[in-house]
């Protein structure tokens, strides 16, 4: 089995105009489509979303399409696939991918504690996500 780094997946999914980028894209395509057993870690999944969204300015629907394709490849194993699938579904609902992946990774817990005030806790509760998301308050020590 071969573990894939984020840059291999980025080169596979994003067209590059320069000569080195084209060569790397071809090498990535050959590897991913070779039938060899490949592994994508959860951290690479998370970093890929950041690269697609942050660097390449991909829209959420484009990121979802990348993950739908990646998850459909029979020779690619994705670490904690159920968590990744939940996070991709949450992205489709407008949730932040990283927040959703963190939450999905804690599915065996009774709750998730956060200081995140960007409404993640409220939205997760409204969506009925389990485990519940608890917003911690600052405390004076």
Report the location of each language-model feature.
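Short, well-structured N-terminal submotif of metal-dependent ribonuclease cores
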Residues: 1-40, 55-62, 127-141
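Active-site flanking residues adjacent to catalytic metal/cofactor-binding acidic residues
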Residues: 4, 46, 115
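Active-site phosphate/pyrophosphate-handling residues
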Residues: 7, 26, 43, 49, ...
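Active-site-proximal, substrate-binding regions of enzyme catalytic domains
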Residues: 29, 43, 47-75, 82
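Active-site neighborhoods of divalent-metal-dependent phosphate/nucleic-acid chemistry enzymes
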Residues: 73-118
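Acidic, PIN/NYN-like endoribonuclease modules and their adjacent C-terminal/linker elements
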Residues: 107-141
């Amino acid at each position: 089995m071969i573990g894939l780094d984020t840059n291999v997946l980025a080169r596979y999914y994003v067209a590059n105009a320069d000569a080195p980028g084209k060569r790397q894209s071809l090498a990535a395509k050959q590897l991913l489509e070779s039938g060899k057993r490949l592994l994508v870690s959860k951290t690479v999944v998370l970093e890929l979303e950041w690269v697609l969204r942050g660097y390449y300015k991909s829209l959420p629907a484009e990121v979802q399409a990348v993950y739908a394709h990646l998850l459909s490849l029979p020779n690619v194993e994705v670490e904690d696939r159920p968590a990744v699938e939940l996070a991709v579904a949450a992205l489709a609902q407008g949730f932040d991918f990283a927040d959703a992946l963190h939450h999905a990774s804690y599915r065996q817990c009774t709750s998730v504690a956060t200081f995140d005030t960007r409404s993640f806790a409220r939205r997760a509760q409204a969506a009925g996500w389990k485990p519940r998301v608890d917003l911690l308050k600052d405390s004076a020590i």
